[in-house]
Amino acid sequence: MDIKLKDFEGPLDLLLHLVSKYQMDIYDVPITEVIEQYLAYVSTLQAMRLEVTGEYMVMASQLMLIKSRKLLPKVAEVTDLGDDLEQDLLSQIEEYRKFKLLGEHLEAKHQERAQYYSKAPTELIYEDAELVHDKTTIDLFLTFSNILAKKKEEFAQNHTTILRDEYKIEDMMIIVKESLIGRDQLRLQDLFKEAQNVQEVITLFLATLELIKTQELILVQEESFGDIYLMEKKEESQVPQS
């Protein structure tokens, strides 16, 4: 079995990688083969005495349950339960794929707009940038995906079209920083309340990513799936001593 070691952002990222190799619709892939490859990958990490985080092991146990259900005799109730578990897994992978495509789209937009800068294009996020504590960027994109979907629905209901010159990231960076004046923090969703169209929403988000990249802003999320807040990055000399 050809399993190459590489870094993944989480178990769904690994599963998406394995599913993508089949070059077919996610719901048509041979799920048993994918499960075997995933378990082989985790087993390889353990055999090499590399740390396997809890989320990978939780997913492994879920996959083993799905696999065991598929091996049981074809009893109606068992088959239905197994099919439900399998469909739920595939739905999770499909949703993750959408979030990843969104991230790639946003990065492409950033690179396109970076051509208007006097400086050379840089990566959206680099290793030293402080995002959500112990989180991956998927948390940020997941939140933004929900915001964008809600704003699209809002714009559609209002049936309004506002014409304006092309939004610029550098202008939006100023707006983001001004939104934090007089505040300790700003809920990410609140940043987009006054946005007039989808293009403005996306440019605001790109501006936020740029400020995070330059470490002018940091993101804070107090609990899993909780709200994400923007905060100004304070100089060490400004941080009160405990």
UniProtKB/Swiss-Prot annotation:
One GO cellular component this record assigns the protein to is: cytoplasm
| Entry annotated with the keyword Zinc-finger | no
The main location class comes to cytoplasm
Q: Which GO terms describe its biological process?
A: cell division; chromosome segregation; DNA replication
**Which key words tag this protein in UniProt?**
Cell cycle, Cell division, Chromosome partition, Cytoplasm
Subcellular location(s) of the protein: Cytoplasm
Q: Does the keyword Cell division apply?
A: yes
Family under the similarity heading: Belongs to the ScpA family.
Assembly and partners are described as: Component of a cohesin-like complex composed of ScpA, ScpB and the Smc homodimer, in which ScpA and ScpB bind to the head domain of Smc. The presence of the three proteins is required for the association of the complex with DNA.
Function of the molecule: Participates in chromosomal partition during cell division. May act via the formation of a condensin-like complex containing Smc and ScpB that pull DNA away from mid-cell into both cell halves.
**Name the UniProt record assigns to this protein:** Segregation and condensation protein A
Tell me the gene name.
scpA
